[in-house]
From Swiss-Prot:
The keyword Plastid does not apply. Transmembrane segments: none annotated. GO terms for molecular function: DNA-binding transcription factor activity, RNA polymerase II-specific; RNA polymerase II transcription regulatory region sequence-specific DNA binding; transcription coregulator binding; zinc ion binding. SMART domains: HOX, LIM. Residues 133-187, 291-335, 365-392 are annotated as: Disordered. Residues 300-319 have a biased composition (Polar residues). Interacts with ldb1 and with the N-terminus of rnf12. Keywords: Developmental protein, DNA-binding, Homeobox, LIM domain, Metal-binding, Nucleus, Repeat, Transcription, Transcription regulation, Zinc. The keyword DNA-binding applies. This is LIM/homeobox protein Lhx5. GO terms for cellular component: nucleus. Residues 151-167 have a biased composition (Basic and acidic residues). InterPro entries: HD (IPR001356), Homeobox_CS (IPR017970), Homeodomain-like_sf (IPR009057), Lhx1/5_LIM1 (IPR049618), Lhx1/5_LIM2 (IPR049619), LIM_Homeobox_TF (IPR050453), Znf_LIM (IPR001781).
């Protein structure tokens, strides 16, 4: 029976053949699938494909945790926390000194290292800078700085020295922008969505939940803890600002309801409040009989009047103000009940009052002018001026009443 090649599946007619993985091959078919070089002495196989030594370790060999490149079997390596590093990659990130076996070091973000000397010097420098900043800063005026510290006091967590390094770096970023900054952690969009969803579910996660988030996102537990502290602090600040804005809105909002421009005033509102409140206090009967219709702004001077009533006749002209009477005040008589006369200043040609022209007025019933009982008292405008009465062809001396 003729043998078939495992590579090209054709019958082998050559004088010589190669036996690889218990199968027959053409000599020319035994080659690396990556670089296409002929394999004569040794080959490596994965998933039915043949590789040379270089390409096999490049693709499937252990990779350096520092540079993410493959590690060949002949390279010298160092291990830290179940991760393998090249000798050149296993260095201090501050002084770039190559770390040797047995030396104490501090690990940051699982793949960065700081030697003991640099860590101690950096910690002492940060403590001195923090003390100088706290001595010149009023803590009572900075709630943004107090909130994360209060959270840390409530959620004290035993962490490694690398966690302390991250916390000191973040405090240094908040307090002094000119100092040397430590390594910053960049949170990707997918990681941020996971953290936000966890914050909505539990704003204060336990250590077990933080460990699960660290496994899901690949972030350090200290980074996750600080993120939750900052997020809670931000939520509190937003609530304080919203509450302060609501109080300011309630304080500056006008408590009085504004009247629409087209609305009509009620007589009770006019007589009870405002600059004409003395009308509501008057106890006399202005409008009992029809003889007072000729005096729309008040009773004749024969009745007993209060000081507010007497001042109204003096101040109710178009040329006067509510604060003071006209220069030429009106003068009235005080006759008996049957004779109500008053000397009014008038002029037949002009509505403005001019002194020196007077005429007597006789009491006339309101039915002469209106054909019925006298209407109730009402104001025509804010100044109290009601205008002249309609002229009638009567045998009396008429005058405009102000």
């Amino acid at each position: 029976m003729m043998a078939h090649c495992a590579g090209c599946e054709r019958p082998i007619l050559d004088r010589f053949l190669l036996n690889v993985l218990d199968r027959a091959w053409h000599v020319k078919c035994v080659q690396c699938c990556e670089c296409k070089c002929n394999l004569t002495e040794k080959c490596f196989s994965r998933e039915g494909k043949l590789y040379c030594k270089t390409d096999f370790f490049r693709r499937f060999g252990t990779k350096c945790a520092g540079c993410s490149l493959g590690i060949s079997p002949s390279d010298l390596v160092r291990k830290a926390r179940n991760k393998v590093f090249h000798l050149n990659c296993f260095t201090c990130m501050v002084c770039n000194k190559q770390l040797s076996t047995g030396e104490e070091l501090y690990i940051i973000d699982e793949n960065k290292f700081v030697c003991k000397e640099d860590y101690i010097s950096a910690s002492s420098l940060k403590e001195s800078s923090l003390n100088s900043v706290s001595s010149c800063t009023d803590r009572s005026l900075s709630p943004d700085i107090q909130d994360p510290i209060q959270d840390e006091s409530k959620e004290t967590d035993h962490s490694t020295s690398s966690d302390k390094e991250t916390a000191n770096n973040e405090n240094e970023e908040q307090n002094s922008g000119t100092k040397r900054r430590g390594p910053r952690t960049t949170i990707k969009a997918k990681q941020l969505e996971t953290l936000k969803a966890a914050f909505i579910a539990t704003p204060k996660p336990t250590r077990h939940i933080r460990e699960q988030l660290a496994q899901e996102t690949g972030l350090n537990m200290r980074v996750i803890q600080v993120w939750f502290q900052n997020r809670r602090s931000k939520e509190r600040r937003m609530k304080q600002l919203s509450a302060l804005g609501a109080r300011r809105h309630a304080f500056f909002r006008s408590p009085r309801r504004m009247r629409p421009l087209g609305g009509r005033l009620d007589e009770s509102e006019i007589l009870s409040s405002g600059p004409y409140s003395y009308y509501g206090d008057y106890q006399g009967d202005y409008y009992g009989s029809g003889n007072y219709d000729f005096f729309p702004h008040g009773p004749p001077s024969s009745q007993t009047q209060s000081p507010a009533d007497s001042s109204y006749l003096q101040n109710s002209g178009p040329g006067s103000t509510p604060l003071g009477p006209l220069e030429s005040q009106l003068s009235g008589h005080h006759p008996s009940e049957n004779q109500r006369y008053v000397d009014m200043i008038s002029h037949p040609d002009t509505p403005s009052p001019e002194p020196g022209m007077t005429g007597p007025l006789h009491p006339i019933s309101g039915e002469v002018f209106t054909g019925g009982p006298s209407p109730p008292f009402s104001m025509s405008n804010n100044s109290g001026f009601s205008g002249p009465l309609p002229h009638q062809n009567l045998d009396i001396n008429e005058a405009t009443v102000w």
